[in-house]
Structure formats: C-alpha cells, structure tokens
C-alpha cells in the first residue's frame, strides 16, 4: 500500500498544558515532554521513517492517556505506511469503545486503510460507508484515495474513476495531481486488461467518461503500440480538453515513439525447412503478424533466411552484407550457441533461445525463450505466496520432466518450501494410480474412512502435454485427493478444448495470449488467426513468441526494459535481466467451468 504523509492532528489544549508543565520542570532538570515526542514523530513522518513514527505515537498513546485514541490511530496509520499490518491492527485494537463516536472520521479512514492493505477492498468500502465524506481536505483526499482504488479492485471501474476524479478537488500540489492522474491511467488500463466493464451512464461528466474511454486506449498503447496511434488520435479528438492530455499521455506517446523506432532493415533467421520447419514457420508467422500491425510507412524492410537450407554462418554473414540493422534468431539452442562467437558486437542480435548457464553473452547479444523451467519457478513462487509451501510433485519420466522438476524444487527450496515426495509417471500410459497412491499415502482400509497424507498443501502436476494432465486430475479425485489444490504449467492447458472440464480447479501460469480476455489481446489473437487461418491453434504460443520478438526489437535498440518498466507483451510482462536474457512475468488462471478464469 502506498504511504501517505500527513501532518499529525493538533492537540492544542493538551499540548499547551504539557508544554507549561515541561517549562516548569526545566528549572530543575531537562526532560522529554509529550510535545517533544510529538514533534519528533512528525519529523519522522516527513522523512518517511514510518516505523519510527509509529513507535513514537504508540509511546505517546501511553504517556498521554487523555489523548490515547488519537495517538493510537496515528500509530496504526504509520504502521500501515510501514507495511506492518500486524502492528497496525494491534495499535488499532487498543482504541477505546468511545473512539467510534469521538473520532468517527479518523477511525474509519484508518480501518479502511488496514482493510485495503489486507487485500479486502470490499471491507475498506464498508468502513468508508459508515461516515459522510470528510470536509477537511487532508481527510477528504485520503477518503477518495482509498475509495477509488478499492472500487477498482472490486470490479467497479466507473465508481473508482469518479472517486479519484473527485479527489482532485482537494489536491493543490502539482506533483500530487500528477500522481493522481498516473494512478487513474494505471487503474483504467488495469481494468481493461482484466476484462472489467468500462461502461458509464449516458449523462456522465466528460472528465470521468474520458478516463474510462482511455482504459482500452492505454492498454493498446502498452500491449500493441504498433496499432495504437490511430486509436489514441481518435480519443484526443473526442476529448481535446481532458486533463490526461496535460501530462500522462505525453509520457505514453514518448514511450510509443520509442516502441516504434525500428532499424531500416531486420533479418529473421529461422529453420523453415527440415526437422524444425513447423516451429520455425509458426514463429515467423507471429513475427510477420506483428510487422503487419504497423502502418506501412513505419515498417522496416524485413528479410527472412532459412538456416536449415544454408549454414548458420552463411545466413548471418549474408544478412549483414545485405544491410541488416538487427538480427532476430536463430531458434534452436545449438544454433544460438553457434552464433554467439560469430556475433560482431555492433549489430544487435535477439536470439530466440538461451545460451548455456555458464556462457556469457557477447555485447549486444540478447536472448528470448519460452522455457518450461521459468514456468516451474513461477509455480514455486505462487504456492509459497498462496501460503502453501509444502507439497508433492508428479512429473513425467523424460528429459522435460527432469528439467521442470529440478527448476521447481530449486526455487521452492530457495523460498523456504519443501517437496515432501516426488513421483514419476510414464506419459505414454493412462493409469497413474500407483504413483498417486504412493505420493499421497492413500490408505483405504475396509470399514474405515479413506485417508491421505495431511502434510501436503499442494500437488504440482508437471504435464508435458495437456492429455496427461487431463487424465491425472480426475484420477487424483478418484483416489480421494481432490481436496488438495493442484498447480501445473501451461502445457496442461489448451484453449477451445471440450476436455478442459477434466482439469477443473487447476491453477497455472500462462501467457496473456492464451488466457487474457481484454479487447486488445483478443484483437491481436484474432488478427493472427485470420491471417494464418490454415494453421492450427496448437501453435498459438509460438505465434505469440514471434509477435513479441518483433516488439522487442525497438526496445532493445533504445532503452532495454527493466524490471520496473516491463513491456506488456502477449507472452507476458517482459524485462531484461543482468545476463541479457528477456524474462517473462506470466498471467495466472484457474480452470472454472472449463474455462480459464484470471486470478
């Protein structure tokens, strides 16, 4: 939760009495007075030392019992700002019963802050509903800040936008206004990204309507800037006086300009014949689909080289001699390893696989890959974040399974979790009963209730194909283990499958292309499927891979995306690590009624 710095409430009568007492005592010896402590606490608030301020206010609540509730609320508020919600609740819990009537506004605001920090936005709104809108500017802006963000989190974008727009009436500082508008832009874009309704009543004021209409535009600016210029221009014609034009959109337009500045010529090196043809063609098609999203005037020249028909070295040198300003490819791990020592360091390369872990990338040599190990690590982080650090794993007996299992186990151990048991299965078989019963320690004694181990709070099913997972999950339920949450990788999910009901309840990470329902991703996905109607949708992830590879070219030439400013790609949120590898943060979904529901 964002920290809010506010001037502590003045306790005029008590402060005056205490200051007089302190002055009298100073004739004998120097002592620290409550007023001194209050000033010190206020100084810590201004300096952003929220934990220190919280402790000081807590001490004041004891030292000045007549003002206990006021100081306890200030302490709780600062603990929230310090992101220590346990301490905040403890301080809040010391309030007297009279605080509800004596300090209704302050009490409700702090209670709402605590609820919001605990991911309970509905609870935050409930607390705010107990009071009238504050008239004190400081309290009013905090009221609308909490109410607006809570409304967005409960899926009410219209109400959230109204609240944050109303908040601006109580903001006089230019920096605070800009921060509020940045928040509005992020919130309406997030609402669009999560498929929330951005509709509004017919007589909605223009500023509110403009923000809501900007949601999808902002998402397109982030996820598909190649196609966004026309959409943005149309919005600006409709809302020429909108406050978003004054700052936040200028930054967005600068980012779009950077995201569409391509070299004059790009070379794409892929296997388009032989053993790797089907994968190479799918990546090429996705790359070209992104290329076609861009207006013809802004497109670079694109030359495609089949590295299966000629040597990699020959294709690379030919691309350079023919004027390539950026190389994308090759695709296989072997070819990427072979290209690295050939790279001249001047012409940037985006390899579509990773070098070995102990191999340093040459200068201007970037790497992008769709690795199951990355998903396995993401699952490990998720189970720990969900409060389920200990569990069991079921993995296939093949090289893919070994890689995924090792990555999952390493990340889980690093985070303090543990795998209680790992069982292996043959993906060519259909009956996995023995592995499941051993893994879950199923006990089925005649005349007694069937039981399974109680120490496992998750089951990780590594499915190298969606077919295996669709067989495993029903068998888990058959063997009385359906009450334990199941996590898997994206390989377990295929879109548009009637058999997805067999993996009901499964939680998994996947790229937005596969699970997002926002209008921008749907437009991209539909345009690719229409352009390559004869291709199978089983190659969707490879289309997305090619699409994002094209998106990465201008970013890597100018300002490579960091973890704090990732690219909103269709394969995930993309950022570059210290080894010049593009990393992906994935979306999360759970199968509900046979369909992926965003988490």
What name fits each language-model region?
Residues 102, 278-283, 293, 297-358:
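Beta-alpha junction/loop-to-helix N-cap segments that form part of ligand/metal-binding clefts
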Residues 26-31, 58-67, 93-103, 129-138, ...:
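Solenoid-like repeat scaffolds
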Residues 370, 456, 473-545:
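Extracellular/periplasmic periplasmic-binding protein-like sensory domains
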Residues 365-424:
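An alpha-beta-alpha
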Residues 320-332, 349-352, 390-396, 446-468, ...:
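Periplasmic-binding protein-like
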Residues 158-252, 257, 262, 299, ...:
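Extended repeat-based interaction scaffolds and adjacent low-complexity, acidic/S/T/P-biased segments
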Residues 22-40:
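Bacterial Sec signal peptide processing site at the extreme N-terminus
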Residues 527-598:
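Segments of small-molecule ligand-sensing domains
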């Amino acid at each position: 939760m964002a920290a809010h710095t506010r001037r502590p409430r003045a306790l005029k009568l008590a402060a005056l009495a205490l200051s007089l007492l302190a002055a009298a005592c100073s004739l004998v010896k120097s002592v620290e007075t409550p007023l001194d402590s209050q000033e010190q606490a206020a100084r810590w608030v201004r300096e952003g030392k929220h934990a220190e301020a919280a402790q000081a206010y807590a001490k004041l609540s004891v030292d000045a019992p007549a003002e206990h509730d006021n100081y306890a609320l200030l302490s709780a508020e600062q603990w929230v700002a310090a992101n220590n919600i346990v301490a905040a609740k403890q301080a809040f819990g010391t309030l007297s019963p009279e605080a509800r009537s004596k300090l209704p506004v302050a009490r409700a605001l702090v209670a709402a802050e605590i609820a919001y920090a605990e991911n309970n936005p509905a609870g935050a709104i409930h607390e705010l509903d107990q009071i009238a809108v504050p008239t004190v500017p400081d309290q009013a802006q905090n009221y609308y800040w909490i109410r607006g963000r809570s409304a967005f989190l409960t899926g009410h974008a219209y109400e959230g936008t109204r609240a944050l727009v109303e908040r601006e009436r109580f903001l006089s500082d230019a920096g605070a206004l800009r921060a509020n508008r940045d928040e509005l832009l992020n919130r309406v874009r997030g609402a669009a990204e999560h498929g929330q309704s951005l509709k509004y009543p017919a007589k909605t004021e223009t500023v509110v309507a403009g923000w809501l209409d900007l949601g999808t535009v902002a998402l397109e600016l982030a996820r598909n800037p190649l196609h966004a210029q026309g959409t943005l221009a149309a919005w600006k014609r409709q809302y020429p006086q909108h406050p978003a034009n004054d700052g936040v959109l200028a930054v967005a337009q600068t980012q779009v300009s950077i995201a569409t500045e391509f070299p004059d010529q790009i070379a794409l090196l892929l296997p388009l014949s032989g053993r790797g043809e089907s994968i190479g063609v799918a990546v090429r098609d996705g790359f070209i689909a992104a290329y076609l999203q861009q207006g013809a005037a802004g497109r670079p020249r694109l030359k495609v080289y089949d590295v299966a028909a000629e040597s990699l070295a020959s294709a690379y040198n030919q691309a350079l001699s023919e004027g390539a300003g950026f190389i994308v490819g090759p695709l296989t791990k072997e070819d990427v390893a072979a290209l690295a020592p050939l790279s001249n360091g001047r012409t940037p390369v985006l390899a579509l696989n990773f070098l070995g872990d102990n191999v340093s990338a040459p200068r201007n040599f970037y790497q992008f890959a769709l690795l199951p190990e990355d998903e396995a690590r993401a699952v490990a982080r998720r189970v720990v974040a969900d409060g389920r650090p200990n569990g069991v794993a079921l993995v296939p007996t093949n090289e893919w399974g070994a890689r995924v299992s090792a990555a999952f186990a390493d990340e889980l151990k690093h985070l303090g979790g543990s795998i209680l048991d790992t069982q292996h299965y043959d993906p060519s078989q259909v009956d996995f009963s023995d592995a499941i019963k051993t893994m879950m320690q199923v006990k089925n004694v005649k005349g007694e209730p069937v039981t399974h181990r109680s120490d496992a709070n998750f089951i990780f099913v590594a499915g190298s194909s969606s077919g295996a997972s669709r067989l495993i999950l029903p068998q888990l339920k058959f063997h009385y283990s359906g009450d334990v949450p199941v996590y898997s990788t994206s390989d377990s999910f295929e879109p548009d499958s009637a058999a997805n009901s067999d993996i009901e309840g499964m939680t998994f990470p996947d790229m937005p292309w596969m699970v997002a329902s926002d209008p921008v991703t749907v437009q991209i996905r539909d345009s690719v499927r229409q352009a390559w109607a004869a291709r199978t949708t089983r190659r969707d992830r490879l289309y997305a891979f090619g699409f994002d590879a094209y998106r990465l070219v201008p970013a890597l030439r100018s300002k490579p995306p960091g973890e704090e400013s990732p690219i909103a790609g269709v394969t995930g949120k993309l950022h570059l690590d210290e080894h010049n590898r593009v990393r992906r943060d994935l979306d999360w979904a759970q199968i509900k009624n046979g369909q992926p529901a965003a988490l």
